[in-house]
Structure formats: structure tokens, C-alpha cells
Amino acid sequence: MKKLTAALCAVLLVFCMFVPGAAAAGPALGATRAYCIIDADTGLVLAQQNMDEELHPASITKVMTLGLACEKAQGDWDDVKLTVSHEDVYSLAGTDSSHIALREGEEVPLVDALYATQMASANDGANLLAEYFGGGTIADGVAAMNAQVEELGLAHTHFSNPHGISDEDHYTSCYDMAQILRWALQQPGFEDVFTRNQMYTCLLYTSPSPRDLS
């Protein structure tokens, strides 16, 4: 019951974020353009408004990115390190997007990439994870994301990147993202990553001292 309640609250809060200003006002459903609350166990829709409207998900995209990374890792994060590619860093040039200043050629522990992507909304971290679960390039990771969308039978979602930077071909609906979150919560380690609100990590390539990702 505790897990179910937490999942439902997470879904509600996620979809209130679709509306500018919603964070300041709180989750007032009457003022929310679109939302979808589901039963995390069954997928049954409990309440909704415009749940199939296609919207730009922004960083909510990272729910899928983190879910696929956790699925591949299967809870075995120890000693897994990822090498930062040129594309991870320089594909974000000029976007003024959130990042953790990864550097090409650096080795990053998988666990740090996961938490940085979730807690700092790091787009370079999301790129790194996409290469990890895609087995090659960022594009391979995006293809895996869209393959998962198809496997889940979702009709109103398409991803063009793993982080959520605006693109005409990058969209989802409240219903689809609720189902993506439901699936992601079933992946080993995802719930811990998704609900963590503070972590210290030592990223030596940006700072010699522990960095607070909260």
C-alpha cells in the first residue's frame, strides 16, 4: 500500500508539472491543463483530464531514460563505469540546458549517472545513460526508448532525445507517461533513484570535494 500511494503521488506531481506555474500553486487539478492518476498495480485510470493530449514532456522524458538504464543494470551497479563520449557533451552546445559538466573521455560510475540525471536533471547524464542502454550512440538509446513505447502499446508518445530538450517530434500524453512511470517502477532500483532527494558524490573531473546533487 505504501508503494502504491507513493507511486500515485508521483504520477500526480509529475503531470501537474506540464502546466507553467503549477509548481508554485501546488497540485490544484482544476487549474491543470492535463493530468492522469492511475492505480500503479493495475494501470486503471482513477482520474484524468485531457489525458491523451500530446504535450512536450521536457525533463519528464528522463523517467523513460532512467527506467531503461535500471532495466539494463538489473540492480547490479557495482563497478559499472561509463565513458563520456564527445556527443554526450557537445550535442548540448548552445542549448543552455542543465548539466553536471561531464568531460569527454571521463569515466563515470553508473550510479552517479543515474542520480545526477534524476536529481540534477543532468542532460549530459541522460545522454550517457542513453548510450549505455542503447548499446552504442545516443541515437541507439532513443531508438530503444521508442521501442519501449511501442512495446507498452502507447499511441501518443515519441521521443527524439533522452533528456527532453524541445523538439517537434518529441511528445507524450499524461496517460502514456503514467504508464511509462508504472513500468519504470517495476525496474530494479528505479524507485530508489526516483524518490531520492539528496546524495553526495565525488566527481573528480568537476570538483575535488563531494558534490551535493540535491
Model-found features: residue ranges?
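Active-site-adjacent loops and short helices of periplasmic peptidoglycan-processing enzymes
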Residues: 24-175, 184-188
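Acidic/histidine-enriched alpha-helical segments
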Residues: 83, 189-203
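Sec-dependent N-terminal signal peptides
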Residues: 7-13
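Single conserved hydrophobic/aromatic residue that forms the stacking wall/gate
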Residues: 205-214
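Positively charged n-region of N-terminal signal peptides that target proteins for export
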Residues: 1-4
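C-terminal segment of classical bacterial N-terminal signal peptides
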Residues: 15-22
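Hydrophobic "lid"/C-terminal helical patch
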Residues: 181
